[in-house]
Amino acid sequence: KKKKEWVLRGDTVLYVNSEDLRRALEYDLEQEKNFSYKGLSMDDVVAHIAKFVSGIWQIHPFGEGNTRTTAVFTIKYLRSIGFDVNNNLFADKSWFFRNALVRANYRNVRKGVEPDMSFLILFFKNLMMGENHELKNRYMIINAPQQSTEQADRTSTEQVPNKLTEQLTAPLLSIVKAIGIEQCSLKMIMERIELKHRPTFIANYLTPAIQNGFVTPLYPNNPKHPRQKYFLTVKGLAIFNSTK
């Protein structure tokens, strides 16, 4: 299947052959299942997710509506591994998302064009880390002026605004550091903070962290769920990244 791409000045991306679809998809999903995120920085996590999603899209398993279905799959998968994401960015920047996937999978040696993940990574930084990179389609056209990533990088949010850090008490900061980029049980967080009195931990640490929007439960409608875990919101991750 071929589709002329505006961002490639009319050229096309090669998709996986239909007879290889199942094998290619199973391979990518198995690789992801066995991948460990432990010890990775958020930048590395985002880069890995971008690469994984780009590979799924390029296999083109969904036929018509492949990009839209890839977006739905991505949202569900990110939620399953602890990220609080929704459809808003995909809806607002659907064309950018598609063009970024095209650029991530396009190679033309004769024209000197190699696959470029940078645009997709900017998209996922906005989605997963709450950053505010400028997402412009015109920057992605092959052989476009070199202002693309330079302009986008200027909006990087490596520093957390002072207002955010001013909200932090010592207990809030300690729970943010204890959770990091993981999904943690209550017991695990208490062990990392070295607290043994559960009511004190819930009253002084967990409840304020949730009320201030730094931490969210995996099962918000069922606080006593047997597999309940907690993870950082985008706001919490911003604080965590600023402390590293």
Range-by-range predicted roles:
Residues 1-244:
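FIC/Doc superfamily catalytic core
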